[in-house]
Amino acid sequence: MKRSIFKGMMCLLLLGVGATSVYAQQQQRKDTLVVARDGTGEYRNIQEAVEAVRAFMDYTVTIYIKNGIYKEKLVIPSWVKNVQLVGESAEKTIITYDDHANINKMGTFRTYTVKVEGNDITFKYLTIENNAAPLGQAV
């Protein structure tokens, strides 16, 4: 009798631990990350938000980017997938950089502003530009 009570209590304990673990994982799942240059979001630059995305996710994460000019060379690595980068407006949400082929002989292919290596990456309502001076070719 004592053995069956002990087994029953152990089963309940294990079920409780398992349910707590599942609940904690659901609480950690974040579907939207907010980027804002002025500090009103969770991140001040887009690269930080991309780096916060979990590797090889099976659900979609939206990185919402508030209006602003984001001067950064953005790289979305191969292990990042199922991500939407959504700007507040195409006219006022701008990702920009100013590399050109003649800087340290980097060549044209390294002058990107955004490099996407991951799969299922979507961009909406934002502008991506290379605003390099007319000193050399740029992507």
Predicted regions mapped to residue ranges:
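Flexible, charged surface loops at secondary-structure boundaries
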Residues: 27-29, 55-58, 78, 116
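Short, T/G/N/S-enriched strand-turn elements that build extracellular solenoid repeat scaffolds
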Residues: 44-55, 70-79, 85
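Short active-site-proximal "capping" loops at secondary-structure junctions
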Residues: 68-72, 90-92
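Right-handed parallel beta-helix/beta-spiral solenoid domain characteristic of secreted/periplasmic
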Residues: 37-42, 62, 81-138
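Bacterial Sec-dependent N-terminal signal peptides
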Residues: 1-28
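Acidic Gly/Asp/Thr-rich repetitive segments characteristic of extracellular carbohydrate-active
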Residues: 30-64
